[in-house]
Amino acid sequence: MSLFDHGVAKLHTLLKEGEVTVTDLVKESFDRIEATDDQIGAFLTLNEDAFEQAKRMDELAKMSDNPLFGMPIGVKDNIVTKGMRTTCASTFLENFVPAHDATVVERLHDAGALTIGKLNMDEFAMGSSNENSAFKPVRNPWDPTRVPGGSSGGSAASVAAGQVLFSLGSDTGGSIRQPAAYCGVVGMKPTYGLVSRFGLVAFASSLDQIGPLTRTVEDNAYLLNTIAGHCDMDSTSAEVEVPDYTAALNQDLTGMKFALPEEFMAEGVAPGVREQIEKAIETLKSLGATIETVSIPSVKYALSAYYLLASSEASSNLARFDGIRYGRRAEADTLDEVFTYSREQGFGDEVKRRIMLGTYALSSGYYDAFYKKAQQVRTLMKQDFAKVFEEYDAIVGPTAPTTAFKLGEQLDDPLTMYANDIMTIPVNLVGIPAISVPAGLSEGLPVGLQIIGNYFDESTLYRVAHAFEQANGGFKMPQL
């Protein structure tokens, strides 16, 4: 039995009683990484000082009242870590070592969590399969011939494989929830502005959000308790009071009303996924909830609007990578050639594709036809979702239309690859929270149930997800 088979609350008790040490937890993590990461490829950088840090924390653990004290965590490699390489899985930043921690990392360290290392991802968070990493693909612990999802593939795979207790990811169009679904773990994308983006390498600033990936809903709530809250270093950080999310966990679902959008169960949803989601809906009903089918017509435009908006913001954000200020610098004779060659050699194909799309959408003569129209669709979607939340407590449906696909299967078909995020993208465009929770297996591969909430109503999502998890059995460990 692994120590990580216990949740945060139980491990905290064991640490307080001296039955387990922080060093034991770190050893568990490193042993598991050594045993499995050649297969999985989840980590890009490991913390060389982890055991030394753990030894200093061993005695303090008995006195700490913070449930995260001594807990090993993995951090997605687009979240900066002081003194530890942050590459965004790109050769452009292959040797970049930040001088400060992201706010979320600082808050976790203040709580006593210990960073084990940096997790693999799609380059600059652009991808749905984690095949776009410049260094190596991440493989799904349930079947190493399949993708773990993206872009937070390393974050999901590391938790599913038992390499760390929990991890941080980022979600721009589903990059926490889709990998969570594919790997059979819990992934929360919080309300935009609830968690500071300071120290997150920007992809699309109006869509990006950091969130936790864990084995259980309870552990997820503990993690969000720590990282949520206003940050003066982030101009988009919301000034809202952060509740204790664990307080919502043991409430039942009696009298709650959920909406099931017909668009989320339309053609394109794999039969095995549909079957598990229909079972999940029956489980929610048995717990006292009412579920009604609704229509959110604007979601049919979500995919097109998202790729125009996200790519437009990316073309602006990634302009800073020029070979001059930091990162890769190509050898060249002129300044223009430095810019050109550095970006040509430093960026992968998917990053170049999105930069070109975004630059085109923002160019003279096309701005109104593409970018402006996409923003109008975004406004329409916000109105449509607001109408649903006037009558319903949450929205439910599949996290992804299929289970994890084979490595290499969709690399030559970007449009099919993009469609994997069709259920998750609307949440980012609207800015509301959503959680993916394991909903069973289809042909031996995990299926995720997505629960979507209103602005800053993460407590309701945890309430629903926890009740469903307890009834459905929750996390299952893949056999590696």
From Swiss-Prot:
Keyword Nucleotide-binding: yes
HAMAP family in UniProt: GatA
PANTHER family (UniProt xref): GLUTAMYL-TRNA(GLN) AMIDOTRANSFERASE SUBUNIT A (PTHR11895:SF151), TRANSAMIDASE (PTHR11895)
Subunit (UniProt): Heterotrimer of A, B and C subunits.
Family statement: Belongs to the amidase family. GatA subfamily.
This protein's GO CC annotations: glutamyl-tRNA(Gln) amidotransferase complex
Pfam families, sorted: Amidase
GO molecular function: ATP binding; glutaminyl-tRNA synthase (glutamine-hydrolyzing) activity
Domain of life per record: Bacteria
Name of the molecule in the record: Glutamyl-tRNA(Gln) amidotransferase subunit A
Record function comment: Allows the formation of correctly charged Gln-tRNA(Gln) through the transamidation of misacylated Glu-tRNA(Gln) in organisms which lack glutaminyl-tRNA synthetase. The reaction takes place in the presence of glutamine and ATP through an activated gamma-phospho-Glu-tRNA(Gln).
Active site: 76, 151, 175
Keyword Protein biosynthesis: yes
